[in-house]
């Protein structure tokens, strides 16, 4: 089987939406029956985004196999059925780390290790490895053409086109076509210069995706085609839309998938986008609206919670409810009190690290519990709910997590000291261990308690969800909290760790140690988020009576 590669680059400015465009194209190709995957190559020096600030970089998306990756992989999984893995994302830092390890080991037999050929060869090897077994692989190059950091990646894909053959490789370039209000026209010059930059390093784009706030007129597309040496039918207009789920249809309507299939000599049926049409219909025709407060510590950059925000929207789709998400800084709860939580139909506390804002989250969990407001806690959101219950119901004064107060009297949340690494070996870690790559990561099995709320929601006795955390419920103090009424609704496959808690005699109070947002998709939703939005809607109706 021959694998075909589509290399996706961006020019003029960053944040054009390369990830969404690549994922949308992949969705169309998948709808034509092709086996498709997507890779993201990030030019930064960090080995992975695991230790990067969410306020700078956005969320860290966790794959099934436990890789901490770029948030674009979340977009990929929400658009196509193929699950991402650690093979789908790597960085300059990872490449250099691998090459330097080989150099120290003597693998290069004393050769002078250089960017070309050693770094570029390592990039090519990883791309080929990630593409094995697929009909089409889309490879998104992070950053903007012209950045120094991207040059090794661009050189590597240029070489791949020569080595694999142009009949099995395509270059797709996203570029900005700005509208000038003063003259009342769009301007193509930035696109021409961006393509010129690509040409200077030996890459001739085959497809141009023109990003604009409006449809790019046919005469302007013809002009771009002429001056950029691209067929006119391969110049695609991609205007701003009110829903990203409209983009597959927008690209298909301009024949992009047909052009690619002909170029790769792929004989496959027409794309059936009926599932996406259903998503668009549900999104455009809600029967009601709810307001859900998300109380977090990184809310100045909503991308820090990208998957949670999308999962809430998916929960809305499954209930035909429009979800209005109100982002609330947990530190504001500490300084201004619970007044800012009033008027919400439900409350969600997402994950996070560090002590800043945690007391505000604990106050939030208590407010939801005492006022019968639907509550969903994720990761840290579960831990603060447990701390609240321990303090205010189980009479464990000043209960806390050892992450925040190492010597507290009631450490109801504590560090896991024994881990299994990716090779299955037992490893002992402590608070002094490296931060990078030292968490419970990836898909883990969870057993649900028979008569629990989550057992009803999932309609299954055992589930698999993804984790990203270092701290767990302290089993030594668990009995005292359970005796006070808290219910453990889910445990790890080996029955050792608490995964889900519920508050009995509450309309809807669920908190989980895992991250359900990573497996939510617009077509399928997720049981927890669908149930949570439904509970918010029911709470709203009760309040209106």
Swiss-Prot record:
Protein's organism: Escherichia coli (strain K12)
Family from the record: Belongs to the CTP synthase family.
Catalysed reaction equations from the record: UTP + L-glutamine + ATP + H2O = CTP + L-glutamate + ADP + phosphate + 2 H(+); L-glutamine + H2O = L-glutamate + NH4(+); UTP + NH4(+) + ATP = CTP + ADP + phosphate + 2 H(+)
EC category: ligase
Annotated stretches, region: Amidoligase domain: 2-266
Listed name of the protein: CTP synthase
Regulation: Allosterically activated by GTP, when glutamine is the substrate; GTP has no effect on the reaction when ammonia is the substrate. The allosteric effector GTP functions by stabilizing the protein conformation that binds the tetrahedral intermediate(s) formed during glutamine hydrolysis. Also activated by magnesium; the enzyme requires more Mg(2+) for full catalytic activity than required simply to complex the nucleotide substrates. Inhibited by the product CTP, via allosteric rather than competitive inhibition. Also inhibited by divalent metal ions such as copper and zinc.
Chain residues that bind ATP: 15-20, 72, 239-241
GO biological process terms held by the UniProt record: 'de novo' CTP biosynthetic process; CTP biosynthetic process; protein homotetramerization; pyrimidine nucleobase biosynthetic process
Alphabetically ordered keywords of this record: ATP-binding, Cytoplasm, Glutamine amidotransferase, Ligase, Magnesium, Metal-binding, Nucleotide-binding, Pyrimidine biosynthesis
Main location (coarse class): cytoplasm
């Amino acid at each position: 089987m021959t694998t075909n590669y589509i290399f996706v680059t961006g020019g003029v400015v960053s944040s054009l939406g390369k990830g969404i465009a690549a994922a949308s194209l992949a969705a169309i190709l998948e709808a034509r029956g092709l086996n498709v995957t997507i890779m993201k190559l990030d030019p930064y020096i960090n080995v992975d985004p695991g230790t990067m600030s969410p306020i700078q970089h956005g969320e860290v998306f966790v794959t099934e196999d436990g890789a901490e990756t770029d948030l674009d992989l979340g977009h990929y999984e929400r658009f196509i059925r193929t699950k991402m893995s650690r093979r789908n994302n790597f960085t300059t830092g990872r490449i250099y780390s691998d090459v330097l390890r080989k150099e120290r080991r003597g693998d290069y037999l004393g050769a002078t290790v250089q960017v070309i050929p050693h770094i570029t060869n390592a990039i090519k090897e990883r791309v080929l490895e990630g593409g094995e077994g697929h009909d089409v692989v889309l490879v998104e190059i992070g950053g903007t053409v012209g950045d120094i950091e991207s040059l090794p990646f661009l050189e590597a894909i240029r070489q791949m086109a020569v080595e694999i053959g142009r009949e099995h490789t395509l270059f797709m370039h996203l570029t900005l076509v700005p509208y000038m209000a003063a003259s009342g026209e769009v301007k193509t010059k930035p696109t021409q210069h961006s393509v010129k930059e690509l040409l200077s390093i030996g890459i001739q784009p085959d497809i141009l995706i023109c990003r604009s706030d409006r449809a790019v007129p046919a005469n302007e597309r013809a002009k771009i085609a002429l001056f950029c040496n691209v067929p006119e039918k391969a110049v695609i207009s991609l205007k701003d839309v009110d829903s990203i789920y409209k983009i597959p249809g927008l690209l298909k309507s301009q024949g992009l998938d047909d052009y690619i299939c002909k170029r790769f000599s792929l004989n496959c049926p027409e794309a059936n986008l009926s599932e996406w049409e259903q998503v668009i219909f549900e999104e455009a025709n809600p029967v009601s609206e709810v307001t859900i407060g998300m109380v977090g510590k990184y809310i100045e950059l909503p991308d820090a919670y990208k998957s949670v925000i999308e999962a809430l929207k998916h929960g809305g789709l499954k209930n035909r409810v429009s979800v209005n998400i109100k982002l609330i800084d947990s530190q504001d709860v500490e300084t201004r009190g619970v007044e800012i939580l009033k008027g919400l139909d439900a409350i969600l506390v997402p994950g996070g690290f560090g002590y800043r804002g945690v007391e505000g989250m604990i106050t939030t969990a208590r407010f939801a519990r005492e006022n019968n407001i639907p509550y969903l806690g994720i990761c840290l959101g579960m831990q603060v709910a447990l701390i609240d219950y321990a303090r205010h119901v189980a009479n464990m004064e000043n209960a806390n997590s050892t992450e925040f107060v190492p010597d507290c009297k009631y450490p109801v949340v504590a560090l896991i000291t024994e881990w299994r690494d990716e090779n299955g070996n037992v490893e002992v870690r402590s608070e002094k261990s490296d931060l990078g790559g030292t968490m419970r990561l990836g898909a883990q099995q969870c057993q649900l308690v028979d008569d629990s709320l989550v057992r009803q929601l999932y309609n299954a006795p055992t589930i698999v969800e993804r984790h990203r955390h270092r701290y767990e419920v302290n089993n030594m103090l668990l009995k005292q909290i359970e005796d006070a009424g808290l219910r453990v609704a889910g445990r790890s496959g080996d029955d050792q760790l608490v995964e889900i808690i519920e508050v009995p005699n509450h309309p809807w109070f669920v908190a989980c140690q895992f991250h359900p947002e990573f497996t939510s998709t617009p077509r399928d939703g997720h049981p927890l988020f669908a149930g949570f939005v439904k509970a918010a809607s029911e709470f709203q109706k009760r309040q209106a009576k």
